[in-house]
């Protein structure tokens, strides 16, 4: 048991220091590792070093039987493969049981995005007379204006925001940084929040910090906190609207491409290493498809 804890602790330090992964990613990795460790104990296997390839097959079979998606299972495999690769590198174990495990073939899913009308509903519900409402409005505007990941948003500091140049410095995956511009709506919302709302919320903080977005107690706003805020805004805006934080990123990319932005520029803004990751956003909305069809097909309208 002591070995198990030490292995996980060393791996977490590696992810933090060498890989510079976000806390959100690290938590997901640890969850997968702990789930596998629990599985091994149930099987009567005393440690990670005793796991064999056939054990990984049983573990993944159970995951499929639970109804987990291929995407979720792929994430678990990637986390455990990285964990064992690290243990091998450190010479803590002799074999990697996940080395021969293949990732399941992914279903091609079109990312869900918001239509302009749905967005406008969200932008109208924050109570900007209150500090929390100022924060919520700034958060919503910035996420849509930049398309940054929620984990990236949580790490933005006040010094990363340039209200004169209308840009924000984003700290992405693998220690990569990029500047993203934002428009006048985001600028005004940020200005109000930074000059007033944030100061009020910080008065409750136990210790000072320079992170841009803060919670009701003045502490750093987490990814879970952002999900909670967006859920609250959705409930106020519409009972039929379903949204998760990443959907604003999908919407950002979709709207840019629908309005004629080139794929390479969108790739840079999103912080994707590979163009293939951005190409999933080349789908177009049903409205745009219909408008294109009605405007260009010779027999779209019956002539009188």
UniProtKB/Swiss-Prot annotation:
Alphabetic keyword roster: Cell cycle, Cell division, Chromosome partition, Cytoplasm, DNA integration, DNA recombination, DNA-binding
Gene Ontology biological process terms in this record: cell division; chromosome segregation; DNA recombination; DNA transposition
Predominant location: cytoplasm
Keyword DNA-binding found: yes
SUPFAM superfamilies: DNA breaking-rejoining enzymes
Location within or outside the cell: Cytoplasm
Core-binding (CB) domain segment(s): 2-88
Any one Gene Ontology molecular-function term assigned to this protein's record: site-specific recombinase activity
Function of the molecule: Site-specific tyrosine recombinase, which acts by catalyzing the cutting and rejoining of the recombining DNA molecules. The XerC-XerD complex is essential to convert dimers of the bacterial chromosome into monomers to permit their segregation at cell division. It also contributes to the segregational stability of plasmids.
PANTHER family reported in the protein's UniProt record: PHAGE INTEGRASE-RELATED, TYROSINE RECOMBINASE XERC
Database matches in HAMAP family: Recomb_XerC_XerD
Name of the protein this chain belongs to: Tyrosine recombinase XerC
Gene designation per UniProt: xerC
């Amino acid at each position: 048991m002591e070995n198990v804890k030490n292995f996980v602790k060393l791996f977490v330090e590696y992810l933090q220091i060498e890989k510079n992964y976000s806390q959100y990613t690290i938590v997901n990795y640890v969850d997968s590792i702990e789930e596998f460790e629990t599985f091994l104990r149930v099987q009567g296997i005393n440690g990670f070093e005793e796991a064999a390839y056939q054990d990984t097959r049983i573990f993944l079979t159970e995951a499929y039987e639970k109804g987990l998606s291929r995407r979720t299972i792929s994430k678990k495999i990637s986390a455990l493969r990285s964990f064992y690769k690290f243990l091998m590198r450190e010479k803590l174990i002799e074999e990697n049981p996940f080395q021969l495990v293949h990732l399941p073939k992914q279903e091609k899913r079109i990312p869900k995005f918001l239509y302009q009308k749905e967005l406008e509903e969200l932008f109208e519900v924050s109570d900007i007379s209150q500090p929390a409402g100022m924060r919520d409005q700034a958060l919503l505007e910035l996420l849509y204006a930049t398309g940054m990941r929620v984990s990236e948003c949580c790490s933005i500091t006040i010094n990363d925001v340039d209200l004169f140049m209308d840009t924000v410095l984003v700290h992405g995956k693998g220690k990569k940084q990029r500047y993203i511009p934002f428009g006048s709506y985001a600028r005004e919302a940020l200005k109000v929040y930074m000059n007033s709302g944030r100061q009020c919320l910080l008065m409750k903080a136990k210790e000072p910090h320079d992170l841009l977005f803060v919670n009701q107690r003045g502490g750093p706003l987490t990814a879970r906190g952002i999900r909670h805020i967006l859920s609250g805004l959705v409930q106020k805006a519409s009972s039929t609207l379903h949204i998760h934080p990443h959907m604003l990123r999908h919407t950002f990319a979709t709207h840019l491409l629908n309005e004629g932005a080139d794929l390479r520029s969108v790739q840079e803004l999103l912080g994707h290493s590979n163009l293939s990751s951005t190409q999933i956003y080349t789908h177009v909305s049903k409205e745009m498809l219909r408008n294109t069809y009605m405007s260009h097909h010779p027999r779209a309208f019956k002539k009188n």
